[in-house]
């Protein structure tokens, strides 16, 4: 076992191979050749003088230094500029909760949606309003009640101006989630 470990150490360069061969030789032969081998080993083990190579780096003046050309960065159009191109509003009269897909896709595309739930039952209407509230929350929009069962879903860049805000807050009986 020690022989296998020793061979592995020699193979990996962790031990000298000469010592391994010495142990295999007989004692008599070892005494006769001890001095010449010891001198050879010391000669082999003596580190060779290392020449230092020093390269001088050329000095570069600041004026001669290469500079890449500067590329101006164009500013992206803000969402307020996109709002000036707003030309469309989607009006949806859902009959069931399955019509939520049309509402979600239109709003996701940045189109304001007017949702009229007067033709729906109360349970489905509440579900659709809850869906719409989550939709506008996730896409940073806003939802406003226009009448008792009509709602406006507007994207974040659309500003709705109206005088009836306080009047609509007093009529909050239908969708009060208490």
UniProtKB/Swiss-Prot annotation:
This is Cell division protein SepF. InterPro entries: Cell_div_SepF, Cell_div_SepF/SepF-rel, SepF-like_sf. Residues 21-65 are annotated as: Disordered. Cell division protein that is part of the divisome complex and is recruited early to the Z-ring. Probably stimulates Z-ring formation, perhaps through the cross-linking of FtsZ protofilaments. Its function overlaps with FtsA. It comes from Paenarthrobacter aurescens (strain TC1). PANTHER family: CELL DIVISION PROTEIN SEPF. Residues 21-46 have a biased composition (Basic and acidic residues). It is found in: Cytoplasm. Belongs to the SepF family. Coiled coil: none annotated.
